[in-house]
Structures are given as C-alpha cells and as structure tokens.
C-alpha cells in the first residue's frame, strides 16, 4: 500500500495548531478544511492531463486539462464532512458520495447505517476523507462498500493516522493509497490516537 505522510511545512504548522487542547470549534473546523485541501493537492498530483485547444483572449491557445477518471469525494459521517469543503476547493466539480458507519458497542465491529453513492462510481476515483485513522475499522468498511459498488480507484485522506490503523488498512486493502498529515505514536487503551487530536467529530460540530 502506498503511504504518504505529507511533510509540507504548512501542513505541519496547521496540524500543530489543531492539537491545542483549548482550540475553538471555529478554528478547528477551519484548519480541518485547510489541511484537507493540502492533502488533496498531494493526492491528485498524479492525475493525467491532456492538451486541448481553447479560444484565448488573443486567439486559439493550447492548454492542459485533467483527463481520465472523474472524481467522487466520500466523506465518512460525521467527521469527514469537516474536510469535504477543503477537498472540493481543488476539485469543485467532483460528485459527492456519503457513507455512514457506527461501531457496535457489544462486538466493537463497524456497522454501515447509510450510504448514498454516485451512480457511476465504477468510473470514478474515490477520495475517502475522515479526520482519523485509528483502528481502521470504519475506513475498511467504507472501502468494502465502495469496492462492492464497483469502484476500483481509491485514495484515503486523513489528518492523523495510527500505525495500528495503517497496518489493518494495508492488510485489508493493499491496493489503496493513504495520504495523511501525520503518523502518530499509536492508540491508547480507549482506542484514541496519541497524541492525536481528541474527538475530531465533537470539535468540528461543537459537541465536545
């Protein structure tokens, strides 16, 4: 599995600000979107382009445009919505597919409860966004859904990843690509990433 930890100074700076314990909901939300935007820039660096001729201000001019697979952005409810706006800054015409996953408190297994995928997802590259890759359960379940629907090109964008989640994702789906702002130390006894960001969903939605 291709794993890219984006080490750009802007990414590291913004992520550092997000780790502040008393950060406001407004600021956390803004930074989640901004880092999501920067991760998208990295994840789309290998998109193919083709030369086309358009009518410029002074006559015909040859330019490059993206060709090939179209894109669908796939936020995992609910926290993934916090990164979606930043992703769409770079791919504003992308279609949006939404997946909802919850964890069964008895079995601790991820359970899909909602999905609304674009009809031609088999023709699109999916950018799956979620702030945290902890155990990897929700992400694996989401990718299972996408593959069952015919999607074959999948990239994962997360703000912070734990080594445990990376290992689980690589075992389940070695063909996907992972882009993250940080690979953190690991999980604590409660399944939270350390040092992590805390509960990203609560911070984005102001329910902390």
Curated annotation (Swiss-Prot):
> What is the regulation of this protein's activity?
Allosterically activated by GTP.
Give the main EC class: transferase
Task: Write out the pathway annotation from the protein's UniProt entry.
Answer: Pyrimidine metabolism; UMP biosynthesis via salvage pathway; UMP from uracil: step 1/1
What does the entry's cofactor note say about binding and number?
Answer: Binds 1 Mg(2+) ion per subunit. The magnesium is bound as Mg-PRPP.
Its needed co-factors are: Mg(2+)
**Family matches, as InterPro entries:** PRibTrfase_dom (IPR000836), PRTase-like (IPR029057), Upp_B (IPR034332), UPRTase/APRTase (IPR050054), Ura_phspho_trans (IPR005765)
**Any single GO BP term:** UMP salvage
Q: In this record, what's one Pfam family? A: UPRTase
Which residues bind uracil per the record?
Answer: 193, 198-200
Q: Which residues bind 5-phospho-alpha-D-ribose 1-diphosphate?
A: 78, 103, 130-138, 199
* Recorded catalytic activity of this chain's protein: UMP + diphosphate = 5-phospho-alpha-D-ribose 1-diphosphate + uracil
Q: What is its EC number?
A: 2.4.2.9
Report if keyword Coiled coil is assigned.
no
- What GO MF annotations does this protein's record show? GTP binding; magnesium ion binding; uracil phosphoribosyltransferase activity
Keyword list (alphabetical) reads: Allosteric enzyme, Glycosyltransferase, GTP-binding, Magnesium, Nucleotide-binding, Transferase
The record describes the protein's role as: Catalyzes the conversion of uracil and 5-phospho-alpha-D-ribose 1-diphosphate (PRPP) to UMP and diphosphate.
Q: Which family does it belong to?
A: Belongs to the UPRTase family.
Name by which UniProt lists this protein: Uracil phosphoribosyltransferase
Q: Which organism is it from?
A: Klebsiella pneumoniae subsp. pneumoniae (strain ATCC 700721 / MGH 78578)
């Amino acid at each position: 599995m291709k794993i890219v930890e984006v080490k750009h100074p802007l990414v590291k700076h913004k992520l550092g600000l997000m780790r502040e314990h008393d950060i406001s909901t407004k600021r956390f939300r803004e930074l989640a979107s901004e880092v999501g935007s920067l991760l998208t820039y990295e994840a789309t660096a290998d998109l193919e382009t083709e030369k086309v001729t358009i009518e410029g201000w002074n006559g015909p001019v040859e330019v490059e445009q993206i060709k090939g697979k179209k894109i669908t952005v796939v936020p995992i409810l609910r926290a993934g919505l916090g990164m979606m706006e930043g992703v769409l800054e770079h791919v504003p015409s992308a279609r949006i597919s939404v997946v909802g996953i919850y964890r069964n408190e008895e079995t601790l297994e991820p359970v899909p409860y909602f999905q609304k995928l674009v009809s031609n997802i088999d023709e699109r590259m999916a950018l799956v966004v979620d702030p945290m890759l902890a155990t990897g359960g929700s992400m694996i379940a989401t990718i299972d859904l996408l593959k069952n629907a015919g999607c074959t090109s999948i990239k994962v964008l997360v703000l912070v990843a734990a080594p445990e989640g990376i290992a689980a994702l690589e075992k389940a789906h070695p063909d996907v690509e992972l882009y993250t702002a940080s690979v953190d130390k690991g999980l604590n006894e409660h399944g939270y990433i350390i040092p992590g960001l805390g509960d990203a969903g609560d911070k984005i939605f102001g329910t902390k």
